Amino acid sequence: MSLVCSVIFIHHAFNANILYKDYAFSDGEILMVDNAVRTHFEPYERHFKEIGFNENTIKKYLQCTNIQTVTVPVPAKFLRASNVPTGLLNEMIAYLNSEERNHHNFSELLLFSCLSIFAACKGFITLLTNGVLSVSGKVRNIVNMKLAHPWKLKDICDCLYISESLLKKKLKQEQTTFSQILLDARMQHAKNLIRVEGSVNKIAEQCGYASTSYFIYAFRKHFGNSPKRVSKEYRCQRRTGMNTDNTMNALAI
């Protein structure tokens, strides 16, 4: 089972260049590191202890905690935390890495506790879910963050630290494309906006379309009806629902 991330406990301060940026890491600091950049920390392994988390553990943690997924524009590749009881954490990591780790439920609770240290950090859930989502799911998460943005394939590659050719290949393996994911996300957002927004021009803009006429064309092709037609159907449904409620109230009286 592949690792998703690691929790690193620093016991000796060190300076490092991670993803072309210089960082100073302090004694007693705790990091959560995406496995995609874990290799950048390898030269400094003598300065820290760590525990790795596989997909099964992350999935179970997300299910048990029931935390809502909140995405960030560019997913963080590592998170930092401080003011943690270092003595206790040191013992936890030592136990989890030892051969004495024979109580599964207890070990699992300790693993969950290590993850929860970062629960208040911005990008926490995104880092975890990016490790267990499909590639298409990761792309969808990114574009959904800001659908009004004129997304290009290169933008997504920069967020995922992956080449354009490799991203295309991985999406092809999942039987989809970047264009299809972007279109589906925008159309679903447009359909939701139509329920509350009357202006087609505004909806087109909020969904990332510079041309309203092209948005109408894309919407009709996707759903089989124009935005105005769908909006009218929603209004009729609401009126029908209100009339039904009024009738029921009258009968009750």
UniProtKB/Swiss-Prot annotation:
GO terms for molecular function: DNA-binding transcription factor activity; sequence-specific DNA binding. Induction: Induced by EvgA. Pfam families: HTH_18 (PF12833). Keywords: Activator, DNA-binding, Transcription, Transcription regulation. Residues 137-233 form the HTH araC/xylS-type domain. Residues 154-175, 200-223 bind DNA. Induces the expression of gadE and mdtEF. Could also regulate the expression of other genes involved in acid resistance. This is HTH-type transcriptional regulator YdeO. It comes from Escherichia coli O6:H1 (strain CFT073 / ATCC 700928 / UPEC). The lineage of its organism: Bacteria, Pseudomonadati, Pseudomonadota, Gammaproteobacteria, Enterobacterales.
